Amino acid sequence: MSRPSKIVIASRESRLAMWQAVHVRDRLSSLNPGAEVVILGMTTKGDQILDRPLAEIGGKGLFIKELEVAMQEGKAHLAVHSMKDVPMVMPEGFVLAAISARENPRDAFVSNKYNGLDDLPAGAIVGTSSLRRESILRAKYPQLVIKSLRGNLDTRLKKLDAGEYDAIILAAAGLIRLGMENRIKSVLTAEQSLPAPGQGALGIELIDGAADMADVVAPLNDPETAHCVKAERAFSRALGGSCQVPLGGYAIIDNGQLWLRGFVATADGQEVVSAELRGNPADDEALGLQLAAELRAKGADAILEKLAHCK
């Protein structure tokens, strides 16, 4: 199969998104020395609407729609995404062709005054962008005040530094990728805050049927990460996972077994259902569906019904 002479990568224009696109560009350039690999930066609807929580404005798809249109119009060959921003059900006509090796998938505690969640006094203001983190915080730290925090990584840190929040919770991966590990006061354990499905991993999206590009990006796929993320996404998808559902799903490969943990909760954190299981990594999506079934058997449907009425 002939290799393309030019490869165009669609990306959001935030600093973190561009880091991710440059990372993929550099890898593709080294794998395809005869090709010109360029980045097409774009602003998405999710980047523009910053005054409301994601759950209110339509969720994850807001960060990828414009990139998909660019591919449909032939302006780009592929798009690079943070996997946690990719809708659980891919739009018709598009596929996830590769999932790259994962950075630290955990949540990070960031503060200028405190070293961890347990150090925060009652009434301290904590900023977060996700219902998942909000429900966890409300369940485990009811004495704290949880406020919505939108914007790109730099914007969120500026709001913290301006004193609008006593602490904020961010994905550790973004801070690490931008060389800002010094802002991390502590990394939350999976027991403290189970990560979102796909957190820390990058996904490469293509037009379905673009066999030439599928061949080009195949070397970017990390099988271990892909098994874990596929299990997490299948679990989330089976429970209607989106920005409107406080849900965590996290898998690792442990002694040759895929260990998948998951939970679903009410937004106020008062009701939480969780479970875990182990199985063959090759059965990734089946394990995700099995874990979702276990949560339903433990009462997750009642929580999902309440969430449906709250929307």
Curated annotation (Swiss-Prot):
Gene Ontology MF: a single term: hydroxymethylbilane synthase activity
Catalysed reaction, written as an equation: 4 porphobilinogen + H2O = hydroxymethylbilane + 4 NH4(+)
Descriptive protein name: Porphobilinogen deaminase
Function: Tetrapolymerization of the monopyrrole PBG into the hydroxymethylbilane pre-uroporphyrinogen in several discrete steps.
InterPro entries the record matches: HemC (IPR000860), Porphobilin_deaminase_cofac_BS (IPR022419), Porphobilin_deaminase_N (IPR022417), Porphobilinogen_deaminase_C (IPR022418), Porphobilinogen_deaminase_C_sf (IPR036803)
Required cofactor names: dipyrromethane
Upper lineage: Bacteria, Pseudomonadati, Pseudomonadota, Betaproteobacteria, Rhodocyclales
Domain of life where this protein originates: Bacteria
